[in-house]
Amino acid sequence: MVKRIIKDIRMKPLDTPKIYYVSRPHYNEGLTAITPIQTSHIAFHFWSNPDRKILHHPDSKCLLEFDLYTCGTLTHRHIERVLHHLTQFGPTHLNLTLLNRNLSLTIDQQSTWDKTEMGWVDWIEQFAK
């Protein structure tokens, strides 16, 4: 998935993705991955047994924190492609923050999605407009 994301957003990998399984402590169990790209990195942690109190939706079964850092340019179309890749995880809730690292660290956009309000694919298409 990470290799396809890098290709879709037209970034250049510096190495292959490194993926690790974390088993302890139990509440932190899941996959951790990082991939360096020419303009920074992509990292994520996928918790398979998170504390239920931190989940935002009653149907949520796991938690994914996905970070794409780049000093390059990402369009809404690029971000739409990344979000489509996350469809395989069956998202139920999303907090999205776009930070501009060009001159300083400023928030360009914050968005929240919940499956009770709108379908995932519909929200992605609306986001990309």
Whereabouts are the PLM-identified features?
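Polybasic/polar functional segments that serve as interface/processing modules
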Residues: 1-129
